[in-house]
């Protein structure tokens, strides 16, 4: 008989979060879905499912996060799978973005993820089991003009995930950073992503086409979010999940291209880069 798992999914009101919640419920699991506003919208979208508990919280507010996790535990007694999905994109040249715009992006995409993870981990550690699935991005492996700042938050998610995995795997908790390519969610809708208010003319040739192309691409992305949700379901039930999972042909192609470029740069500069050690000194290494 299948063991009923309990999921906690942030940003569950739409996009990936909604589809993952729907897939988990269809598989017979329970879901704590968190939303920033309009909790009744998620309840209605999932047809008042008896195994759904909706909690309103803002991931940037640590007190709200702690309270929401406690509510979820009180309802279903445990959490088995955390999906850190809440986040948003920002299209801008790096110089164009103000300090406030950058900090807001990091508050949600990075510090919000950390807030939720800190709130859930004590319960996972207590049971010596569980999964942490962090939704990253293809831009967490490589970036294009206009997506550099957003990509930097996803590079952070990849690094945090790798560090968490090293610390949590010995405790029986698996961590995976999932980097999707472009999927037909509302990520590229003008209601979802943010554009910096300042536009600098010098970046028109590089960022301009990205800025104008986002609207044209919206709704025409190659990935199916329902199929993505099935991948997450499979991942959550895999005995030995990967640390990094790129999802979508575009994400894989982008990562492979970046890896090849990096390998070429390492080779081209190898003699220079390895010429910096002290002469005749044996030093310790942090690399196991």
Specify the residue positions occupied by each region the protein language model found.
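Conserved glycine-rich cofactor-binding loop
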Residues: 13-15
């Amino acid at each position: 008989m299948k063991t009923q798992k309990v999921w906690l999914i942030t940003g569950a009101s739409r996009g990936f979060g909604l589809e993952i919640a729907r897939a988990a419920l269809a598989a017979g699991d329970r879901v704590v879905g968190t939303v920033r506003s309009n909790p009744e919208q998620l309840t209605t979208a999932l047809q008042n499912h008896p195994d759904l508990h909706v909690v309103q919280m803002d991931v940037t507010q640590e007190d709200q996060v702690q309270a929401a996790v406690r509510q979820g535990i009180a309802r279903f007694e445990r959490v088995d799978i955390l999906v850190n999905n809440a986040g948003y994109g920002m299209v801008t040249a790096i110089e164009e973005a103000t300090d406030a715009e950058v900090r807001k992006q990091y508050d949600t995409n990075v510090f919000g993820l950390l807030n939720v993870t800190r709130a859930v981990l004590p319960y996972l550690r207590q049971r010596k089991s569980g999964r942490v699935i962090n939704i990253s991005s293809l831009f967490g492996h490589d970036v294009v003009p206009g997506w550099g700042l957003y990509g930097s938050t996803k590079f952070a998610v990849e690094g945090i995930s790798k560090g968490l995995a090293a610390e949590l795997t010995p405790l029986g908790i698996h961590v995976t950073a999932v980097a999707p390519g472009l999927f037909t969610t509302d990520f590229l809708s003008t209601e979802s992503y943010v554009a910096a208010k300042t536009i600098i003319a010098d970046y028109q040739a590089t960022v301009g086409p990205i800025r104008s192309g986002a609207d044209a691409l919206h709704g025409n992305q190659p990935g199916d979010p329902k199929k993505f949700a099935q991948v997450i379901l499979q991942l959550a039930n895999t005995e030995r999940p990967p640390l990094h999972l790129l999802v979508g042909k575009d994400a894989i192609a982008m990562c492979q291209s970046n890896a090849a470029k990096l390998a070429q740069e390492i080779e081209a500069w190898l003699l220079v880069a390895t010429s910096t050690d002290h002469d005749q000194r044996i030093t310790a290494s942090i690399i196991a």
